[in-house]
């Protein structure tokens, strides 16, 4: 297999934190190594787990194993990979995702335009059994996957899905990398670290864009613990809290742009669809309607709870975990001060 063109070389980064996912992590790495064209560099960043790092060094070939030197959590691990990347484009693949053939080629193709600062691919759930009957497709983001409401063709978006995304390495480093004040730590269902960085990237470079490329597809393993309705509610709650963090950092215009459309257009259409299905005798439609209303209400409650917790706090300038320097506040026409 030929490598990706040197002018657009690629470093693939997989971040892992537990040996419980060892077989999935190996599958993720293998899927990256067997892309055609292949990446010039594949990195496994281990998030503060010495036993996992030692095992990876013993058993893996063709992969550079690094231990995270950042704050514990996904953002710190991703920053470690970003700093170690030697290629112009850094691609992030989740440790429980497997890239399909053609994934890498499709993901980096938009970089032929200098205005492209990041790309993201489609993420498809791989269920341990049947798909959850009660889960509305508009809420597949709860299990880390693409959801109904996203574009079905190559389109400009605000931010990619973290399970399968790429960034121009130098620009991401210049922007200060991922903010370790947001994002997952272990099994914590927080998120939005890629959203916050994506907004900073485009705000710092007028005219820059991020593309969603559905053909760059990965399969995301859905673990058994994510099949519970309790997880669904918890994930929605923490999404609301995370959105409050992002809005504090970048303003509500940019921080809630996509969410407003999803709430005003996609969710009402989903409820109408399920209402018609219920009238047609689909008993599962009632469960999906209930989940839709519960999910939306929980996200909103989490968001306003997060905002209330932040009320009265001074907005301290964000400090880059990569350089220690103060990041400029993101306040532009796209993200006005509230």
What label would you give each PLM region?
Residues 162-167, 171-175, 182-216:
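A short, conserved alpha-helix in the catalytic core of glycosyltransferases
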């Amino acid at each position: 297999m030929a490598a990706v063109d040197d002018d657009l070389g690629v470093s693939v980064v997989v971040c892992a934190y537990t040996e419980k996912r060892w077989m999935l992590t190996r599958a993720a790495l293998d899927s990256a190594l067997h892309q055609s064209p292949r990446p010039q560099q594949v990195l496994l960043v281990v998030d503060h787990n010495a036993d996992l790092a030692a095992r990876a060094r013993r058993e893996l070939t063709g992969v550079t194993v690094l231990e995270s030197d950042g704050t514990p959590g996904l953002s710190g691990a991703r920053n470690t990979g970003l700093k170690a990347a030697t290629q112009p484009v850094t691609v992030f693949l989740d440790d429980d995702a497997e890239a399909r053939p053609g994934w890498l080629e499709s993901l980096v193709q938009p970089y032929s335009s200098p205005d492209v600062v990041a790309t993201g691919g489609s993420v498809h759930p791989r269920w341990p059994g049947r798909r959850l009957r009660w889960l509305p497709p508009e809420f597949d983001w709860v299990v880390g996957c693409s959801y109904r409401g996203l574009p079905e063709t190559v389109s400009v978006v605000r931010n990619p899905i973290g399970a399968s995304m790429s960034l121009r390495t130098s620009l991401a480093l210049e922007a200060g990398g991922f903010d370790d004040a947001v994002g997952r730590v272990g099994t914590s269902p927080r998120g939005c670290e890629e959203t916050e960085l994506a907004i900073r990237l485009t705000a710092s470079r007028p005219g820059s864009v991020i593309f969603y490329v559905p053909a760059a597809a990965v399969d995301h393993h859905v673990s058994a613990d994510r099949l519970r309705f309790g997880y669904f509610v918890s994930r929605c709650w923490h999404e609301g809290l995370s959105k409050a963090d992002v809005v504090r950092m970048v303003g509500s215009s940019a921080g809630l742009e996509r969410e407003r459309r999803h709430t005003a257009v996609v969710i009402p259409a989903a409820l109408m669809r399920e209402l018609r299905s219920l009238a047609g005798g689909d008993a599962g439609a009632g469960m999906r309607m209930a989940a839709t209303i519960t999910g939306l209400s929980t996200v909103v409650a989490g968001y306003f709870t997060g905002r209330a917790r932040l009320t009265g706090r001074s907005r301290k300038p964000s400090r880059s975990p990569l350089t220690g320097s103060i990041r400029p506040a993101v306040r532009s026409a796209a993200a006005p001060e509230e």
